[in-house]
Amino acid sequence: MIYAVFIFNNKGKPRLTKFYTPIDESIQQKLIGDIYAAVSTRPPTACNFLESNLIAGKNRIIYRQYATLYFVFVVDEGESELGILDLIQVFVEALDRCFNNVCELDLVFKFQEIHAILAEVVSGGLVLETNLNEIVLAAQNQMPKTKRSNAMPFSNTLSSFATRF
């Protein structure tokens, strides 16, 4: 079972937090800090798996760093570490496809879409889908279509304003 999913930047700011077990909010905040501290202080050559007792007894923290972001899954002992690493890879590739090279700002300003993509991959702590194409297709069908404005672009408005004077 997957207990929680986090995305942190390299400064420790959580960009996505999703708990699949009921945990008091004050404890959640402490867990987020503890997990970031455990992951961020490891050398780059260290293994991407950590044994932990932070959530629901004995569990594992499995993470992967991409540029300035840490993608972290907290799972029970029944989950395959390599399977979760692959799942993180699939999740990141789905984000990349949906946002054309996802960056930290996408995580900040499009958090609802990020949660929708995660919901296509994991629900209730269980893995739902690992097929990248299916995840992207389902997520794109859920994302709101942005409407084009009929208003004049700002640059045209500014130039027409300047010609009047």
Curated annotation (Swiss-Prot):
GO BP field: Golgi to vacuole transport; intracellular protein transport; vesicle-mediated transport
Keyword Hydrolase appears in the UniProt entry: no
Keyword Membrane: yes
InterPro entries in UniProt: AP_complex_ssu, AP_mu_sigma_su, Clathrin_sm-chain_CS, Longin-like_dom_sf
Membrane topology of the entry: Peripheral membrane protein
Domain of life assignment: Eukaryota
Listed PROSITE patterns: CLAT_ADAPTOR_S
SUPFAM superfamilies registered for this protein in UniProt: SNARE-like (SSF64356)
Compartment list: Golgi apparatus; Cytoplasmic vesicle membrane
Alphabetized UniProt keyword annotations: Cytoplasmic vesicle, Golgi apparatus, Membrane, Protein transport, Transport
Gene Ontology CC terms, in alphabetical order: AP-3 adaptor complex; cytoplasmic vesicle membrane; cytosol; Golgi apparatus; intracellular membrane-bounded organelle; nucleus
Pfam families, sorted: Clat_adaptor_s (PF01217)
Family of the protein in this entry: Belongs to the adaptor complexes small subunit family.
Subunit structure: Adaptor protein complex 3 (AP-3) is a heterotetramer composed of 2 large adaptins (apl5 and apl6), a medium adaptin (apm3) and a small adaptin (aps3).
Role of this protein: Part of the AP-3 complex, an adaptor-related complex which is not clathrin-associated. The complex is associated with the Golgi region as well as more peripheral structures. It facilitates the budding of vesicles from the Golgi membrane and may be directly involved in trafficking to the vacuole.
Name recorded for this polypeptide: AP-3 complex subunit sigma
Lineage summary: Eukaryota, Fungi, Dikarya, Ascomycota, Taphrinomycotina
